[in-house]
């Protein structure tokens, strides 16, 4: 996949390519009880094209590199692939530390700069015991950009002196940790480079800055939405876009009976669905309108948590469609705020600030007042939720 545009560019004048709708092919294969394999798929596609007059094709504009969509898509997919490798290496490192340096996780958060910096110089508990406190402090102090106190170093040494890890650790265990640390550093460098490329390409699209106005939508998430959506005009309405994002509910109907499962269809782009879900995770905590909707649907029932999340993701997908279609930024409307309970309104206005520097690194959002005037604000009190 993702190479059709290159094939298309290499065609002669008398040649053309048509793209089959994969859902249509899957449904046709299932209806004829044909197994799934590459040879059988080729035979199935050949049979469909030759015999079925109702065959469904995809608009070939989807695969054109117009406005850099395909370049951005390739970068986003590569970022997801490397991020997955990064998570795997981190998990392997934590597993090794559980055996050779368990005390470190009680002082520094795994994946943190301090955690990696300590392991790069002192891969085991006994390396710390034999080290200088001031030397360890200087390493951590530099890695955390001067945000570390000596108290944490003292706590680390105190825990290490009471360790249960034997002192006869083989050199292989130490070398595995050092190798994992080096791999993680390399992967982080690759991620930063790709993120820079993604921002450069995505910023050329006018929808990029508009999407950043959605509560919880960061630079990488906005770039993913643009890459996976392409030209918003190819969707007839918001329902079509929601269906493509895979956030639409999956219901079963038989006559007048409707079975509501509270699950999503998971059709379309999984990258787009993940991006929308990440936006929804932040928005349900900090956007007052969506927060109230989430709490109303959940109604204190833990079993309805996922159902409420799906509802918020569905709402976010509709916001995205409206923003990209109308080329307008997202604004929390005054009339929507005034419908909320007083406690929710108070919590919202108590967590934002209208006074912030022009060069702030925080995400800037908007809400309207009773006169329709739009005000920009930043959040000052946030839970530990990342905007990516």
Task: Please state what every model-predicted region is.
Residues 1-158:
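Phosphate- and other anionic-substrate recognition elements at nucleic-acid/protein interfaces
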Residues 53-57, 89, 126, 188-195, ...:
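Short helix-capping/linker segments at secondary-structure and domain boundaries
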Residues 80-83, 87, 182-192, 314:
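Generic structural signal for well-ordered, non-transmembrane alpha-helical segments
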Residues 109-122, 184, 188-198, 220-232, ...:
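Amphipathic, charged-and-aliphatic alpha-helical interface segments
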Residues 144, 210-213, 219, 223-301, ...:
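Phosphate-backbone recognition surface of nucleic-acid-processing proteins
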Residues 160-220, 284-291:
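Helix-hairpin-helix/helix-loop-helix acidic hairpins
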Residues 256-260, 294-313, 317-388:
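Low-complexity, acidic/Ser/Thr- and charged residue-rich accessory regions of DNA metabolism proteins
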């Amino acid at each position: 996949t993702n190479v059709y545009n290159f094939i298309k560019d290499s065609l002669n004048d008398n040649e053309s390519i048509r793209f089959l709708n994969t859902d249509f092919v899957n449904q046709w294969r299932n209806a004829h009880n044909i197994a799934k394999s590459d040879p059988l798929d080729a035979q199935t596609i050949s049979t469909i094209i030759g015999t079925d007059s109702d065959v469904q094709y995809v608009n070939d504009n989807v695969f054109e590199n117009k406005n850099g969509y395909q370049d951005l898509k390739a970068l986003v997919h590569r970022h997801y692939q490397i991020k997955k490798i990064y998570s795997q290496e981190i998990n392997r490192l934590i597993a090794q530390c559980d055996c050779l340096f368990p005390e470190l996780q009680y002082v520094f958060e795994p994946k943190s700069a301090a955690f990696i910096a300590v392991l790069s110089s002192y891969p085991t508990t006994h390396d710390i015991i034999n080290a200088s406190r001031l030397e360890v402090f200087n390493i951590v102090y530099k890695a955390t950009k001067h945000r570390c106190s000596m108290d944490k170093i003292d706590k680390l040494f105190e825990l290490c002196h009471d360790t249960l890890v034997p002192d006869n650790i083989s050199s292989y265990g130490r070398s595995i940790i050092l190798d994992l640390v080096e791999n993680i550093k390399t992967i982080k460098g690759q991620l930063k480079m790709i993120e820079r490329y993604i921002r450069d390409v995505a910023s050329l699209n006018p929808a990029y800055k508009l999407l950043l106005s959605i509560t919880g939508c960061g630079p990488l998430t906005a770039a993913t939405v643009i890459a996976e959506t392409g030209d918003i005009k190819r969707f007839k309405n918001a329902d079509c876009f929601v269906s493509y994002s895979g956030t639409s509910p999956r219901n079963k109907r038989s006559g007048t009976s409707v079975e509501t499962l509270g699950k999503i269809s998971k059709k379309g782009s999984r990258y787009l669905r993940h991006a929308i879900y990440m936006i929804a995770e932040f928005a349900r905590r900090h956007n007052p309108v969506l927060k109230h909707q989430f709490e109303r649907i959940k109604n204190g029932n833990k079993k309805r948590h996922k159902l409420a999340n799906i509802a918020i993701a569905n709402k976010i997908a509709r916001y995205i469609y409206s923003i990209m279609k109308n080329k307008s930024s997202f604004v929390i409307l005054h009339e929507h705020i005034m419908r909320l309970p007083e406690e929710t309104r108070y919590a919202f206005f108590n967590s934002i600030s209208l006074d912030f520097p022009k060069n702030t690194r925080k995400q800037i959002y908007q809400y309207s007042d009773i006169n329709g005037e739009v005000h920009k604000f930043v959040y000052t009190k946030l839970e530990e939720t990342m905007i990516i």
